[in-house]
Amino acid sequence: MADAAPFVRWVGGSQKSLPALLARLPADVADRRYVDPFLGGGALFWALRPQRALLSDACAPLMAAWRALALDPVGLLRELGVLQALRSTRSLPEWYRLVTGLLDEDGTDAERGARLIAVNRSCFNGLWRVNGSGRFNAALDPASGGRDLVREDLLRGCAVVLAGADLDVQARSWEATIEAAGAGDFIYADPPYDDEDDGPPTLLGGPLAVQGHRYTAQAWTRGDLVRLADALARAADRGAHVLSTNNPTAFAGEVFASRGFTVEVETVTRSVSRDASTRGAVDELYATRRSS
């Protein structure tokens, strides 16, 4: 059986940042509940394999995949097998249009999760992107036709890890997730990143340039970054240990530093991005605040 690891590729994924993240964890992280309001592929979760976790993301199909993997892995594997068999009966573009058209349809977690995984395995560079109406609109990778959608060993390995943990897995807002955290928790927040191209760093700045790529229908703004830092600071005041990441812009650094966070910058590697210029070695901001 393959070892557990991220089962989807996600923009901004933390896999290549793990050494920098692990170096900034609290010494008692194994004793704390793990809280992640921007879960994505969950690279840090898979590295830590916490026994207790509160996991959330605004992308509902993604969270359906996580829940299915935790609660109905057999059903998830079955549905992925159905989609893989269907792919062999259609042209690849026709199959892709069919499956992406089902992403917003109702269904069981296994059905919705399988659609998400199949599309993630088939879209260009694993790039989850939606339009202003919230509908998925990333392009098909024409070289994806031979990829295994099921990856049974990997998914079964992930399911074993999830089955052994006390998990709360929901599609909920980051605000609600952080508000539920406090004493004894460790929060890892990896939100959409700030961008210097936004112009003057005002608290009411418009949508971030990075949100030319949308993860959800609601664009992320600098006002959201301020609200996030405030929410994380309040959680630290309640006793949580907080670690957040971002681009090392002057604005992001000031937002976190002014709220009592220790701000550091380190070079990491990223391989999934809408912008090819941001793949490879990039500087990343790490903001930590220990529990009060």
Predicted stretch roles:
Residues 257, 261-292:
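Class I S-adenosyl-L-methionine
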Residues 38-43, 154-155, 247-250, 291:
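Short, polar loop motifs at secondary-structure junctions
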Residues 36-38, 56-57, 170-172, 189, ...:
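Short His-Asn-centered micro-motif
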Residues 58-62, 194, 266-273:
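Short, acidic/turn-prone active-site loops that include or flank metal/cofactor-
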Residues 2-18, 24-29, 73-213, 227-230, ...:
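SAM-dependent nucleic-acid methyltransferase catalytic core
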Residues 224-269:
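Conserved Class I SAM-dependent methyltransferase catalytic core
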Residues 30-87:
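Conserved S-adenosyl-L-methionine
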